[in-house]
């Protein structure tokens, strides 16, 4: 073979050499759709947990993943259209949270993998046939929704034994609320307490909801897990403090002045979502990824608030707390 022909052969063959033997081509950029139920600002901590999890698995925005965000800003009716936008943008995987978010995502596609970062019982809501074998294109994480809401009543009653009229904020737009209410009514009966429910469909309803509960002699307050109420927990906690109402909600609420918090650790749920994304991007089908249940729960007591309300928290309850705020 002539020298010139040999050089041509070598140069032409280089294009077929394996990647390790060539200059690395640009890595594939996976497109991730994020369907948020409220706003980015209200879920900053959770989104950072997701990004941290992805980074630990080798995924970084601007390098090998691009995340396209859509937020419904608390308007659940916008979710289907936002989900459709993400699906149309040719994403590789769709992330969302809550039952309304999961339903909108599921209705938008039966092909693109969906990972639910946190939702109530996905089986009872009809989104999957079973936790062990979700089938279809949806998997993710769930938490003991109704049980958490009912447990809050037990805890606030333990902290405030004299409370017999327990107020509950409910967003009727969230279909998961009914199962939680059923469990809470059962628990209230066992505690010999009356449950006073008030609907909160939007942020503007919160002040009026407080006025309604205080006029009915409410002695303690909680709410049914819902993205709208969760994202406004600090505001609700501040109003509870102003109205001298012992309240139990989640961690941001306790940090903002609520007496107590009991909830699944949302940071952990969003962080764990990254592992589902990794497996799906590497070829595992959602139907082959069993749904995980929340593993971390937090009990937090704000002793500063207890003092301000003139309450003495029982020592056994303090001993069970994961965190004390004083």
Give a label for each model feature.
Residues 1-326:
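Short hydrophobic alpha-helices and adjacent helix-cap/hinge residues
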């Amino acid at each position: 073979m002539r020298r010139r022909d040999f050089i041509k052969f070598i140069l032409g063959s280089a294009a077929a050499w394996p990647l390790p033997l060539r200059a690395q081509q640009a890595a594939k950029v996976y497109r991730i759709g994020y369907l948020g139920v409220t706003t980015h600002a209200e879920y900053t901590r959770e989104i950072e947990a997701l990004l941290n999890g992805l980074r630990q698995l080798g995924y970084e925005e601007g390098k090998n993943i691009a995340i396209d965000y859509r937020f419904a800003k608390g308007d659940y009716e916008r979710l289907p259209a936002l989900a459709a936008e993400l699906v149309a943008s040719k994403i590789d995987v769709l992330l969302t949270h809550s039952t309304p978010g999961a339903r909108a995502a599921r209705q938008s596609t039966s092909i693109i993998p969906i990972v639910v970062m946190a939702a109530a019982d996905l089986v009872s809501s009809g989104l999957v046939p079973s936790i062990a074998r979700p089938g279809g294109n949806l998997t993710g994480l769930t938490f003991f929704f109704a049980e958490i809401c009912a447990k809050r009543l037990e805890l606030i009653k333990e902290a405030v034994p004299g409370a017999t009229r327990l107020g509950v904020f409910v967003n009727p737009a969230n279909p998961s609320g009914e199962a939680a209410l059923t469990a809470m009514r059962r628990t209230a009966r066992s505690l010999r307490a009356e449950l006073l429910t008030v609907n909160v469909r939007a942020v503007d309803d919160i002040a009026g909801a407080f006025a309604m509960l205080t006029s009915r002699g409410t002695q303690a307050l909680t709410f049914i897990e819902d993205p709208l109420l969760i994202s406004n927990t600090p505001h609700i906690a501040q109003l509870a403090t102003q109205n001298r109402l012992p309240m139990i909600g989640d961690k941001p609420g306790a940090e903002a002045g609520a007496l107590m918090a009991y909830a699944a650790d949302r940071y952990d749920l969003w962080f764990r979502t990254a592992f589902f994304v990794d497996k799906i991007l590497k070829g595992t089908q959602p139907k082959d990824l069993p749904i995980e249940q929340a593993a971390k729960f937090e009990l937090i007591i704000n002793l500063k608030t207890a003092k301000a309300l003139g309450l003495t928290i029982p020592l056994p309850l303090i001993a069970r707390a994961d965190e004390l705020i004083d």
